C-alpha cells in the first residue's frame, strides 16, 4: 500500500548510505526513487484486484521495470520462467505483502494468503513467516488492535523478539536482507513510533536494508495511524509511474476507500520538485543508470554487472568481493560517477 511505498521511496537513498538518527531533512531526498519493493507491492495489488496469478503479474512488472534493484535469484526466476520457487528466506516476501492485510477479512485468510503469495519465490519457512507476520500486523492494525495486542500476537505466533526498542537495536544493527533479521526490527520501529512520519524516521534510523525495512514499517504504520499525511502521500504517489498510480488508487477504491489517496493521485502529475537534483556527498546517479551498472547476488551483495544482458560475475570474482558495505561502496564508486 502507499505506506509501504513511502517507506521504500524514503529509504531508497539510505540503503547503501545508512544514517543512525531520526532528524534527517527533508523526509524525501530529491534523489529518492521507487525500487523493487514498490514495484512488487503494486504488482501484488494488481494481481489481487484482477484475480490474476501473482507469478504472471510479477514477471510482467519485471519487464516494465527491469532495473529496479531486484536480487540475483529473482532476476533469474523472472528471466528463465522455470516455474519453481527458490527457497528464499529473504525479506522480499515481507516487503511486498502489505495488500494482503487489506484484501482479506479474517486473520486465518490473511495468514493463508500471505503464505500463498510469498511461496511463488520465498518458499523457505522463514520467508513465509516474514510475510505472514507483516500481513498479520497490518490486518490487526487496520482492525483497531492496540500496539500491545499486536506485539503479543506476533511474539506468540512467530517467535520474534519484540521486547526491544529502536534505541536497543540501533547501535549494533547492520545490513541484513533476511526476514528474520529485518521483519522484527521493522515491527519494533512501528511499535516505538508516535505517528506515520515518525515510524518512517524510526525505521530509517536503524540503518541496515533501509528501503525494505522502512517499506515494512510504513505498511504497518499506515494501517495503524490511518490516512498518510497529504503532503507525504502526494510525494510518494508522484514518484510512481502513471500506470502504477492507477493500480494503487483502484486497489484503495476497492478495499480501503480514501479521499486522501484519490487527491494524491490527482495531484501527483502536477507535483514538481522545487530545486534541481544535486550531487550526493558520496555519489549521485539516476535510478535507471544505477541499476544498469550493478546487480545484487543471492546474498544481497551489490556487484558490478559484466554485460548489459545480465551476465554475472564468475564465482572467483564473487568470492573476492567483501560483504562489507563500506568496502563495496569504495570499490564500486567509480561505477556511479556521472
Describe each region flagged by the PLM.
Residues 1-338:
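Structured, active/binding-site neighborhoods that engage oxygen-rich ligands
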Amino acid at each position: 500500500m502507499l505506506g509501504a511505498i513511502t517507506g521504500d521511496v524514503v529509504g531508497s537513498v539510505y540503503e547503501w548510505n545508512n544514517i543512525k538518527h531520526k532528524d534527517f531533512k527533508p523526509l524525501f531526498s530529491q534523489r529518492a526513487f521507487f525500487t523493487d519493493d514498490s514495484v512488487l507491492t503494486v504488482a501484488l495489488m494488481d494481481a489481487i484486484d484482477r484475480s490474476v496469478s501473482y507469478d504472471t503479474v510479477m514477471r510482467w512488472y519485471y519487464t516494465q521495470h527491469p532495473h529496479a534493484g531486484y536480487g540475483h535469484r529473482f532476476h533469474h526466476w523472472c528471466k528463465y520462467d522455470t516455474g519453481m520457487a527458490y527457497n528464499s528466506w529473504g525479506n522480499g516476501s515481507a516487503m511486498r505483502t502489505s495488500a494482503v492485510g487489506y484484501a482479506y477479512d479474517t486473520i486465518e485468510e490473511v495468514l493463508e494468503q500471505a503464505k500463498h503469495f510469498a511461496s511463488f519465490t520465498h518458499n523457505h519457512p522463514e520467508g513465509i513467516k516474514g510475510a505472514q507476520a507483516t500481513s498479520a500486523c497490518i490486518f490487526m492494525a487496520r482492525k483497531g488492535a492496540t500496539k500491545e495486542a499486536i506485539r503479543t500476537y506476533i511474539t506468540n505466533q512467530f517467535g520474534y523478539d519484540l521486547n526491544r526498542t529502536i534505541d536497543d537495536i540501533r547501535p549494533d544493527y547492520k545490513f541484513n536482507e533476511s526476514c528474520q533479521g529485518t521483519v522484527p526490527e521493522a515491527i519494533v520501529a512501528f511499535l516505538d513510533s508516535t505517528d506515520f512520519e515518525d515510524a518512517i524516521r524510526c525505521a530509517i534510523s536503524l540503518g541496515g536494508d533501509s528501503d525494505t525495512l522502512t517499506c515494512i514499517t510504513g505498511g504497518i504504520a499506515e494501517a495503524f495511524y490511518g490516512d498518510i499525511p497529504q503532503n507525504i502521500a502526494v510525494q510518494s504517489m508522484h514518484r510512481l509511474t502513471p500506470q502504477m498510480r492507477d493500480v494503487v488508487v483502484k486497489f484503495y477504491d476497492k478495499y480501503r476507500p480514501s479521499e486522501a489517496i484519490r487527491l494524491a493521485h490527482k495531484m501527483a502529475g502536477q507535483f514538481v520538485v522545487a530545486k534541481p537534483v544535486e550531487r550526493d556527498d558520496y555519489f549521485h546517479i539516476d535510478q535507471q543508470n544505477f541499476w544498469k551498472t550493478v546487480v545484487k547476488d543471492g546474498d544481497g551483495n551489490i556487484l558490478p554487472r559484466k554485460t548489459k544482458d545480465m551476465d554475472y560475475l564468475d564465482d572467483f570474482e564473487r568470492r573476492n568481493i567483501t560483504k562489507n558495505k563500506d568496502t563495496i561502496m569504495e570499490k564500486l564508486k567509480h561505477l556511479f560517477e556521472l
